[in-house]
């Protein structure tokens, strides 16, 4: 049996081949009724779009890259799942690259890995600086995740400073006064850790609590062993916190282990809150309070924005009336309060 073609879909739907093409390419000017009729015809006949041919005609590969520091960090694995799902809905394939938080790898990603294989890149940088983004040509189109490094770049994130302020307020509202920030960084950088530390400091100031730089517990990376080591070291050196703000859930889960080994009860003696709402925090003992970013929204906004930039970059001359200014998109977050701060899970 011959494969159905566009003209077969058009005949079945009672429309022109051009209208079928417009529906396939998701042009906005097609009426909802016509769009529905054409899609029903496509489903009935089993018509399949030749994606490779369509992409090549438009000067595209149909492939985007997602570049994250480490895939075995649960937040990035969960984010990748959402990005893949969102891209599939737009007939895009996702190539996942692990940068290892290495500046050379992140710079290579910004340059499109030295090839035209990918149409655009979603990049979560940890090592790049604002200077690294200066003088970019805009090719390949790139959307940054995390903190805004440079005003001229498209960017999607939660409001990390506000989220950390809210999490610290929650701890203070429980009557905690000796709040340590695990992974906190008190420098002038523009990264996520610095933004969350600013939020932590702002909440202390609001409550009239003094800020002590020694309350920032440095970590080598944002993994469970690093959180455990940082908290164990602080306790061994005589620190007596009654709360921990951990800059991600991996650090928080490590902190829970260290507190347990030192005979410290959670949350009776020390309340603990993390960031990211990864699956492991829902099954830890106690379950972990956390800041939950809307990961699905981060993925959706990032893919939408990148697709728009790709269309701008590959459109024929005169087909785009004006290039949209760089976008700084903030997506929602919420506090999820569980046993590690409340003693029970809030429903």
Give a label for each model feature.
Residues 1-62, 345-347:
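N-terminal helix-turn-helix DNA-binding module of bacterial transcription factors
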Residues 178, 211-215, 265-271:
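Short acidic capping loops at alpha-helix termini that bridge into adjacent secondary structure
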Residues 232, 236-243, 248-347:
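Flexible loop/turn connectors
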Residues 124-166, 186, 209-210, 250, ...:
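Flexible loop/hinge segments that line or gate small-molecule binding clefts
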Residues 51, 69-78, 96-105, 156-166, ...:
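Hinge/beta->alpha junction and helix N-cap segments in small-molecule ligand-binding domains
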Residues 117-124, 180-183, 217, 238-248, ...:
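Periplasmic-binding protein-like
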Residues 12, 17-22, 57-70, 170, ...:
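Short beta-strand segments enriched in small/hydrophobic residues
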Residues 32, 45-112, 116-120, 186, ...:
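Amphipathic helical "hinge" segments at domain boundaries
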């Amino acid at each position: 049996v011959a494969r159905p073609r566009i003209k077969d879909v058009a005949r079945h739907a009672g429309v022109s081949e051009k209208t079928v093409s417009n529906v396939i390419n998701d042009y906005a000017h097609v009426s909802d009724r016509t769009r529905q009729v054409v899609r029903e015809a496509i489903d009935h006949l089993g018509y399949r779009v030749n994606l490779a041919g369509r992409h090549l005609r438009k000067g595209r590969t149909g492939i985007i890259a997602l570049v994250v520091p480490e895939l075995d960090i649960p937040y990035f694995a969960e984010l990748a799942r959402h990005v893949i799902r969102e891209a599939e809905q737009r007939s895009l394939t996702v190539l996942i690259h692990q940068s290892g938080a290495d500046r050379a790898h992140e710079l290579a990603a910004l340059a499109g890995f030295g090839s035209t294989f990918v149409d655009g890149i979603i990049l979560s940088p940890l090592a790049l600086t604002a200077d690294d983004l200066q003088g970019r040509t805009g090719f390949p189109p790139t959307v940054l995740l995390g903190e805004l490094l440079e005003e001229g770049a498209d960017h999607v994130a939660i409001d990390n400073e506000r989220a950390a302020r809210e999490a610290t307020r929650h701890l203070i509202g429980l009557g905690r006064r000796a709040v340590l920030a695990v992974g906190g960084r008190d420098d002038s950088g523009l990264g996520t850790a610095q933004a969350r530390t600013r939020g932590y400091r702002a909440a202390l100031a609001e409550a009239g609590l003094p800020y002590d730089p020694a309350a920032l517990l440095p970590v080598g990376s944002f993994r469970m062993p690093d959180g455990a080591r940082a908290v164990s070291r602080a306790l061994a050196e005589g620190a007596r916190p009654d709360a921990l703000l951990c800059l991600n859930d991996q650090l928080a889960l490590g902190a829970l282990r260290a507190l347990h080994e030192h005979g410290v009860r959670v949350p009776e003696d020390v309340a603990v809150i993390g960031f990211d709402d990864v699956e492991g925090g829902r099954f830890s003992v106690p379950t972990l309070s956390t800041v939950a970013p809307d990961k699905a929204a981060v993925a959706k906004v990032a893919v939408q924005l990148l697709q728009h930039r790709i269309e701008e970059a590959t459109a024929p001359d005169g087909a785009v009336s004006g290039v949209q200014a760089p976008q700084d998109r903030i997506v929602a977050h919420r506090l999820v309060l569980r046993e590690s701060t409340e003693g029970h899970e809030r429903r």
